[in-house]
Amino acid sequence: MEHISTTTLIIILIIMVVISAYFSGSETGMMTLNRYRLRHMAKQGNRSAKRVEKLLRKPDRLISLVLIGNNLVNILASALGTIVGMRLYGDAGVAIATGVLTFVVLVFAEVLPKTIAALYPEKVAYPSSFLLAPLQILMMPLVWLLNAITRMLMRMMGIKTDIVVSGSLSKEELRTIVHESRSQISRRNQDMLLSVLDLEKMTVDDIMVPRSEIIGIDINDDWKSILRQLSHSPHGRIVLYRDSLDDAISMLRVREAWRLMSEKKEFTKETMLRAADEIYFVPEGTPLSTQLVKFQRNKKKVGLVVNEYGDIQGLVTVEDILEEIVGDFTTSMSPTLAEEVTPQNDGSVIIDGTANVREINKAFNWHLPEDDARTVNGVILEALEEIPVAGTRVRIGEYDIDILDVQDNMIKQVKVFPVKPLRESVAE
């Protein structure tokens, strides 16, 4: 290289550093890309995204290509730097060139391009793919040889090389992504997405109207009583049964009954029974996600929940499931819960023992245990493992609870002292 001028060698050296920076930045940019955004861009027809996605299908080949290119360029730059140093400073130039080149490569060919690529992966990766794609084809024999040697060495060390890493997200990972997307997703939409993810964890038992609260009509009652119940029913559908709810025979749409009553034709018990729909039964313990699909598939909106013995346990509707996703359609607190809860001036809350724990937690942002019992009475009995007497105080989690009234082996009323006053809990 004696016939090449020192200036030319320095220019070539600078070019080598730039090429090294290109390989370093390309590697970081490719590996830090958001794969899901990349797939979306590729599906939208973005050519650069398609090219990058194709390169990333074989990450081992891409990494080998980048390392081969980077190392070849750095070795060449080291040789050129040594020659330039010796020309300028003699034998001492070797040490000077080594120190200067190490600093230059470290800063300008490693740290700087990789930092920029990590901050702006798309702006680096997409343009880089224009050169990397043809380079990969050109250097395929060398890349293949390097990968073959690497795989052989890994097998010798007992490392498996045929492991396929899934690119799909787990539910917990998806939950984390939703939590961290507050700047892009509104709080309400965020809550809805998280609720959808929670549907599989919840069953119809968690949201059903308990058997004791199901309102139905005994068809053995006198006709005037039946008409009066239909006229004053606040529900869209009502269960028709014979003597006992366990002998439920059909589900009547109240609006259809009103329509028949308004017509000139005579509205009789037989007419009512013919207008009623067959009862749809839901097995106890069915996940909400499964039941929502079944409601849709069977074109049903309400079902009676039964246990393994066929006994009716409660009633569940499509609206109940949808409210778990989007929140209550009416008020922040259900009418039933509003009757069961009485806030006190001292920040405590008097609650009926039959109140649903999940509804209380949702309404007041509390954290009472929900896994083992559905009602306040059940939660306290589960904690005490005995029936308490009035005046007993129990601490469940962070809540002090006074037992106010016990009747018929059941806790009728309690007073809960939350850590934060009720207004603060609801505000959060």
UniProtKB/Swiss-Prot annotation:
Residue stretches making up the CNNM transmembrane domain: 2-192
Membrane topology of the entry:
Multi-pass membrane protein
Cytoplasmic side: which ranges? Answer: 1-3, 86-91, 151-428
| GO cellular component terms listed in the entry, alphabetical order | plasma membrane
Q: Does the keyword Transmembrane helix apply?
A: yes
Q: Which SUPFAM superfamilies has this protein been placed in?
A: CBS-domain pair, FAD-binding/transporter-associated domain-like
Task: Establish whether keyword Repeat is in the entry.
Answer: yes
Top-level taxon of the source organism: Bacteria
Q: Where is each CBS domain found?
A: 208-270, 272-332
Query: Which Pfam families does UniProt cross-reference here?
Result: CBS, CNNM, CorC_HlyC
User: Keyword annotations for this protein?
Assistant: CBS domain, Cell inner membrane, Cell membrane, Membrane, Repeat, Transmembrane, Transmembrane helix
Q: Where in the cell is it found?
A: Cell inner membrane
Q: What is its main location?
A: membrane
Which GO terms label this protein's molecular function in UniProt? flavin adenine dinucleotide binding
Q: Where are the transmembrane segments?
A: 4-24, 65-85, 92-112, 130-150
Ranges facing Periplasmic side: 25-64, 113-129
Similarity comment: family membership: Belongs to the UPF0053 family.
Protein known as: UPF0053 inner membrane protein YfjD
Its taxonomic placement starts with:
Bacteria, Pseudomonadati, Pseudomonadota, Gammaproteobacteria, Enterobacterales
Recorded name of the encoding gene? yfjD
